[in-house]
C-alpha cells in the first residue's frame, strides 16, 4: 500500500475502497512548542496507571482536569460527558479528488464532551505515534455535522481532541491535540487549533 501510495477506506456493510494519495488520509501530529509543555501536579489514584486502555487514557485526562485546562482553560468547568458509543450512518464526502459514499457505516466514538454549544469528540491512544488515520476523527465529526445541519442538535462548533499517553516509570506524559475541519465535506481539510503536553508530577 505504501509503495502504491494507497490507503483503504471503510464504506460500511463489509465494503471497502482503495484510494490513491496517503497524504489525504493520514495526518502527522504537529510539534508541541516548549511554551505549551506543562508540569501537572497530581495525586495518583488507584486506577490511574492500572491499565493502558483508550478508556483509561481519557479517564485520566478528565479526572485530573487536564482536558478542562486544555480545552476550556478552566479546571472547574463542568462540561456534559458522554461515554463510548457506536453508531451507524450514511455519509457522503470527498477525499482528494475521490467522492466517498458510505452506507450504514459503523463508527466508534471514544468519548464526547459538550460545553456551551461546543461539542468535542475524543480519540485516545497509547504511545506517541507520528501520525493517525484522519477518518478516526472525521467520521464522528461528519456525523455530528449532519445532525447540526438537520437541526437535530443546536451546536455552535464541533471540534476533535486526540489524547496520547506514554507511561514513564510510575507516571505518564499526555499530549493533547485539538482539531477541526474547515470543510465538513472534505476529509483532508483537517486543521490544528492548538496542542499541549502535560507531564504528570506526583505530589
What are these regions (language model features)?
Residues 1-203:
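Charged, terminal alpha-helix-loop-beta segments
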